[in-house]
Amino acid sequence: DLRRALNAATRKLDAWAMVDDMPPGNLRLRRQIALRYLAQGFSVPVEEIVLSHGALEALNLCLQALTRPGDAVVVESPCFYGALQALERLGLRAIELPTDAREGLDLSALAGVLERGEARACWLMPNFQNPLGALMPEAKKRALVELLARHQVPLIEDDVYAELYQGGVAPLPAKAFDRQGLVLHCGSFSKSLAPGYRVGWAAAGRFAPQLQRLKLMSSLS
């Protein structure tokens, strides 16, 4: 069904379709993603959503928007190996913090790092952390977002496994508790719908203009 729908849509494309879909990306798809957030109980403006070629590109765009070579980024220990590779490629340093297999990152350790002003950003997986599978409780997610807001340190939220939840009500992302536009929520349909289509996005908060500009530059190169 998905293949037939894609073929039908492709046949209907006109010469201006590629121009219309330049960054931040297809408006109809961004509206549908915004509706998905609304269905979870919180609002994300369509203008905040930037489409990408899978979640990993979105995560990399977030890193580029927030950091410069030599900056330090907080990650979980252990963490997704692709995060460490991305940091190394951009000349960034990893601050690895202990992570519980049930409830996720140690917020006390994070508070110490933030008090010392050592971190430029955080790359974390509050939901279904890779490789531990930890699911941070909602109260702890709220505390995480509030802690980062006090120090004005942005959070890159890697939420690629959210679509695989098998229970009745999916856990909220940390983005749901963001009131200052500091959480850059990255998602993807690659794990649940069609890995080969590489459809991802970032709901980038106050950093959406920077992401859109970076995505445009990479699309034109």
Predicted feature residues:
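PLP-dependent aminotransferase class I/II
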Residues: L182-S221
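Short, Asp-centered acidic motifs that coordinate Mg2+ and/or phosphate
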Residues: A119-A121, V153-P154, L184, V199
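Conserved core of the PLP fold type I
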Residues: L6, R11-H151, E163-Q180
